[in-house]
């Protein structure tokens, strides 16, 4: 009975010692968190292994992530995976479609994105661009003559239109002098003519009478305006003036209209601020609807594919620029010892517990062997 009690005792003690030893060894990986001193003498094995080697652990974790986990080959393979690409394209299409079918106005959406004063800034920018383009255009064209500035087709149209312009002018003049207003105006002109020619012509005017002179002059004026020779004369005059104009510099326009006035007139006609305001008041859906299908079906898949292709090609360079090893190292270095302990234990809790049990099992087995040895020795 004493023999079996001894074996049971040695087995129990061995199990307790083995389990406790392993448990203590595991605890000593993390604890104590700080070095302990007796006077000036530092107690051995303090701090624990992981607190003591935390900086080295951070460096090694950074290297492990870069060299074995997030490798260029692994990421490149993932980026070129067909299923991954399809999934990413589908996700991008859904997200872009959500934005393009949004019923909010552009103004409200931009305000949500903290884009302030967008209307004023866009208006000023557009006006600035228009102003610069107009000024550049005028600077260039002011160095030309009208013959150089106007296209050949415009020259042909103007020259072919001159006879029609002559006919139009003469036709309107004929209509005017045939009207009562024209006759009255002609009568006044005759009065003024005789009034400026002295006493003799006044006597002639009084002798003939004003009305009879108008009645005689009016048909002659109308007859003159209707003659082919008059039309040809006016056409020749207009043609000569056109030839003179072609040889003159466009810059002469500035004598009558300054650049600033031209720019101001064009900006007023364009109504940039009003146009921008109307555009911003439209919903995102209204603005995007004409291009929505093209964007979803063609642009998004093409853009995602090109980005992934570029990423796969340059993944090594991107990872080098990111300095992942340094990021991991810095993050781990900022962990408190308690957090680092919780992190490791959350991953290895079951395994460490099994190590404790294994220590107890081995200790118990050693206790049994010791008991058997004692039995044989007696």
From Swiss-Prot:
Source taxon at top rank: Bacteria
Spans traversing the lipid bilayer: 1-21, 357-377
Membrane topology reported for the UniProt record: Multi-pass membrane protein
Swiss-Prot/TrEMBL keywords: Cell membrane, Membrane, Transmembrane, Transmembrane helix
Localisation: Cell membrane
Alphabetized InterPro entries for the sequence: DUF445 (IPR007383), UCP032178 (IPR016991)
GO cellular component: plasma membrane
Family: Belongs to the UPF0754 family.
Name of the featured protein: UPF0754 membrane protein BCE_0952
